Amino acid sequence: MLPSWKAFKAHNILRILTRFQSTKIPDAVIGIDLGTTNSAVAIMEGKVPRIIENAEGSRTTPSVVAFTKDGERLVGEPAKRQSVINSENTLFATKRLIGRRFEDAEVQRDINQVPFKIVKHSNGDAWVEARNRTYSPAQIGGFILNKMKETAEAYLAKSVKNAVVTVPAYFNDAQRQATKDAGQIIGLNVLRVVNEPTAAALAYGLDKSEPKVIAVFDLGGGTFDISILDIDNGIFEVKSTNGDTHLGGEDFDIYLLQEIISHFKKETGIDLSNDRMAVQRIREAAEKAKIELSSTLSTEINLPFITADAAGPKHIRMPFSRVQLENITAPLIDRTVDPVKKALKDARITASDISDVLLVGGMSRMPKVADTVKKLFGKDASKAVNPDEAVALGAAIQAAVLSGEVTDVLLLDVTPLSLGIETLGGVFTKLIPRNSTIPNKKSQIFSTAASGQTSVEVKVFQGERELVKDNKLIGNFTLAGIPPAPKGTPQIEVTFDIDANGIINVSAKDLASHKDSSITVAGASGLSDTEIDRMVNEAERYKNQDRARRNAIETANKADQLANDTENSIKEFEGKLDKTDSQRLKDQISSLRELVSRSQAGDEVNDDDVGTKIDNLRTSSMKLFEQLYKNSDNPETKNGRENK
C-alpha cells in the first residue's frame, strides 16, 4: 500500500528539518554495542559499516571486568579467562544492574546468582564490590566502553572522542542516563543513545529502497526487545516497542546451572551451590553446552575434579540434549510471547502485515526461539543480519549520520514507556504515551489542590498503570513562589521534553507569576556530578596504571631477549673470551634477570633501573665482542696465537 500524501509530506518536511537542524561532527564517530555478555565496535568505511577486531583478533569482546590481587584491571577475554580462580572479583552481566535500585526485585534475584557482591550504595542504587572497593555499574560499563574505544583507536590510528552507544529499547530513563554516564567516566562523548533493535534495523535496511514493515526480535545476553518499524527509502520509523529488561542468555545459563547442580546433588549428595570456584566452572560449562546445542542435538557436560569428599575426588559427567534444554528453559522462551503481541497491537497491525522478521542477539540462535518466532509471525526469520554484529553495525550507521558521512538516512525512534506526573489522589496523569516518536515535547495545564498553596511538588513517573504507586518514580522537583489563591485557580504549565536519546527534561511554570522550575531527569537515583568526576579521575589513574604495566612488560621482554642473546654469545665464544670478562657479563645477566623477576612478581621496581641495567649489559657485551672481533681479524694477534 502506498503511503498517504499527508504522511509523505510530513515525512519529507521532518527529514529536511532534521538535516538542517542537526549539527555535523567533524571528528570520527564510532558505533558501540555495549552488550550484557559481549560488546562490539564498528565504524563506517565509505558506504559500508565494518566491525573492528579487538587486540585478541575477535570481532566481539566479553563484557567482563576483573581485578587481580596485584591491583591490575583486566577487561574482555583476559578477564573471562581467569574467572574460575578469581570469581568473586570478576564482574560480568553488570548491564543488568545499570540504573537500578538495590531494592528492585530483579537485583534481589541476581544477588544469589552471581559470585561477586552486589551492594547498596548510599543513594540506594545497586553497585558491585571487588577487592574491597565498590563500583557503579556505569563505571564497569565505562571500562568496557574504554576497551571498545581503544580497539577503534588502534584501527584508525587516531584518537576517538565521540560515539553512538546502543541500549535495550525497553531501558527506562535512569538506565539510559547511566549509559551516558559510562561514556563520560572514560572521556567518551556519547552523542546519541540508540535502541538496539532500531540499530539492527538500520544494518538491515541501509541498502533497501522498497517500503517494508519489519519486526526486530532481539533476545540478547540480558535483555529482550521487540520493535516494529516502517522502512521506506531511508526513513526508519519505529511504530512500537516492548520487551523485558531482565530476560536473556544469562537467565538461560542460570536455569542450566541450577539443573547441573541439582543433578550432581542427586547423584552424590553434595551441594555445590556454595562452592564459588565450582559454580563458576559449571556456569562456563553451561554456557558452552547451551551454545553447542544450537547446532547439535546432544552434548556432554564434563567437569573433572569438581570437588572431593572422604572417598576421593568427584567429577561431573552429564549427557545433555537439546530437548532437555528446551524443556528447562521453556518458561523463559514463553516470556517473549506477550511482549510481541503487545507490540503488534500498539503498532495497530497484525503478524501478516510484517514483511521480514530479524533475529538479533546471541540467544536468537537457539532453534526453539526461532520456532517460537515462526509461530508468532507465521514465517521464517530473515537471515540478512548477523545476530551478534547487527547492533554495532547499526550504531556505526547512526554515527555516520551524525558525522555527516551518511545523509540519506532518517531515524524516528519512540519512547518505550508512558511519561506523566502524579495528580490528586495518587493518579498517574500521562503527558506522553508510550511509543510516541522522539524527540517529543508536550505541555498541559494543571492547578493547585488546596487553597493558599504557594508551591507544588512535581513528581515524574514512567509506566503504564493508572496509579503512581504501580509505576516508577524517575524524578521530582518543586515549583515555589506561586501567589496564594483559591484551589484550582493558579495555572501551572507542565512541559515534558524528550530528546533523541530518550532523556527527559521536565519543567513547570506558573503562568501568573512566570516563576518556573525544571529538572533533567536522571532517575530517582543516578550518579552525582561529584561521583562522575571521581570516576573520571579513577579511569585516568587506571589508564596510567595500564600504560605503566604495558611498559613494564615491554621492558621485561627486552631484558629477557638481551640476556638470552648475550648468554648464547658467551657459550659460542667461551674459549676465546677472557674468563674475568665472561664472568662479569654473566653477573650482569643474573642481576638483570633478578630485577625483572622482582618486577614481574609485583615488587616495587623502577623501570628506569631495569632500563639502566639493560643499557649497561648491552654496552659491556658490545665492547667485549667488538674487541673479540678485532682480535680475530688482527694478523699479528692471529699469528701470535698460532705460534704459541
Curated annotation (Swiss-Prot):
NCBIfam families: PRK00290.1, prok_dnaK
Name the record gives this protein: Heat shock protein SSC3, mitochondrial
InterPro entries in alphabetical order: ATPase_NBD, Chaperone_DnaK, Heat_shock_70_CS, HSP70_C_sf, HSP70_peptide-bd_sf, Hsp_70_fam
Record flagged with keyword Ribonucleoprotein: no
Similarity-based family: Belongs to the heat shock protein 70 family.
The keyword DNA-binding is assigned to this record: no
Gene: ECM10
PANTHER family linked to this entry: HEAT SHOCK PROTEIN 70KDA (PTHR19375)
Gene Ontology molecular function, alphabetical: ATP binding; ATP hydrolysis activity; ATP-dependent protein folding chaperone; heat shock protein binding; protein folding chaperone; unfolded protein binding
One Pfam family, short name: HSP70
GO CC annotation terms, alphabetical: cytoplasm; mitochondrial nucleoid; mitochondrion
GO biological process: chaperone cofactor-dependent protein refolding; iron-sulfur cluster assembly; protein refolding; protein targeting to mitochondrion
Superkingdom of the organism of origin: Eukaryota
Keywords: ATP-binding, Chaperone, Mitochondrion, Mitochondrion nucleoid, Nucleotide-binding, Transit peptide
Function: Plays a role in facilitating the assembly of some protein complexes inside the mitochondria. It may initiate the events that lead to refolding of imported precursors in the matrix space.
Protein's cellular compartments: Mitochondrion matrix, Mitochondrion nucleoid
